[in-house]
Regions:
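Active-site-adjacent loop and "lid" segments of alpha/beta metabolic enzymes
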Residues: 65-73, 111-116, 172-176, 199-225, ...
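Catalytic beta/alpha-barrel core
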Residues: 69-71, 85-99, 108-121, 132-143, ...
């Protein structure tokens, strides 16, 4: 299996469980820096490698009137502060091919949103930056179908690819996670990350915005780690009820440390007693 490194944080192989985490969207400069610092403090105590993630533009919000973020220029400036002042690797998403090059100047890895996981020009542009690419699996795709998206990246000479499971559409306004997806994705030869919080969205289920079921974060995250994923993706907020995006499915900051304590123990058992599936 290919091992992927994002700013010194390793995914796959014999690396310990890694975490990609942050707020869904950059809400303000002060909030982003404060939250990043507090997340780093917690992950450092638990010895969990951290990649910080926040979006500068949520281009696929349900409603035209929903908060999208500060935009690319201001967003990248804020992420650059997080990177250099806190020493954290940065991952953020792009929605257009023209965003790839400027984002790659700041971010240590580029993310392809699940809704855009088949957009060839976007994937090729991300690959050509030479940065690691985190491919979110579309909510409409079978695990094995991600081999075609992976091939679009590797065909450009970039072997640094991660695939992230974020649930599959299950009727209207609902998602589910099929645990069989994790071993199937690992057979594609790339590290696998589990996006727990997005998997708990109820898309469009709250009158123009997505609802969510954050109460299931602990069991889903535990199951994913037990299934042998290489990393977890968590949206984290210090006050989810006031979050400007994805609050209903976000992990409350004050619940992060006990969650990581549990997950680290599970990961240690998986890594020391069995080969990852």
């Amino acid at each position: 299996m290919e091992t992927v490194t994002i700013g010194g944080v390793g995914f796959g192989g014999n690396h310990r469980l890694a975490l990609i985490a942050g707020p869904c969207v950059i809400e303000s400069e002060a909030h982003t820096l404060s939250l990043a610092k507090r997340i780093k403090t917690i992950t450092s105590r638990q010895n969990v490698p951290l990649v910080f993630k926040a979006s500068f533009d949520k281009a696929n919000r349900t409603s035209l009137h929903s908060f999208r973020g500060p935009g690319i220029d201001e967003g990248l400036r804020i992420l650059d502060r997080v990177k250099h002042e806190l020493g954290l690797p940065i991952l953020t998403d792009i929605h257009e091919a023209t965003q790839a090059a400027p984002v790659a100047e700041i971010a240590d890895a580029l993310q392809i949103p699940a809704f855009l996981s088949r957009q060839t020009d976007l994937l090729l542009a991300a690959a050509r930056t030479g940065r690691p690419v985190n491919l979110k699996k579309g909510q409409f795709l079978a695990p094995q179908d991600m081999r075609y998206a992976i091939a679009k990246i590797t065909a450009s000479g970039n072997s640094q690819v991660i695939v992230t499971e974020r649930g599959v559409t299950f009727g209207y306004n609902n998602l589910m996670v099929d645990m069989r997806a994790f071993p199937q994705l690992r057979k594609l030869g790339v590290p696998v990350v589990f996006d727990v919080t997005h998997s708990l969205q109820l898309p469009g289920g709250a009158d123009g915005v997505s609802n969510g079921q954050a109460e299931f974060i602990v069991p889903l995250a535990s199951a994913g780690v037990a299934a042998g994923v290489d990393g977890l993706f968590l949206e984290i907020h210090d006050s989810p009820s006031k979050a400007k995006s994805d609050g209903p499915n976000a992990c409350p900051l004050d619940e992060l440390e006990p969650l990581l304590q549990r997950l680290v123990r599970i990961d240690e058992v998986v890594r020391t007693t069995t080969a990852r599936v």
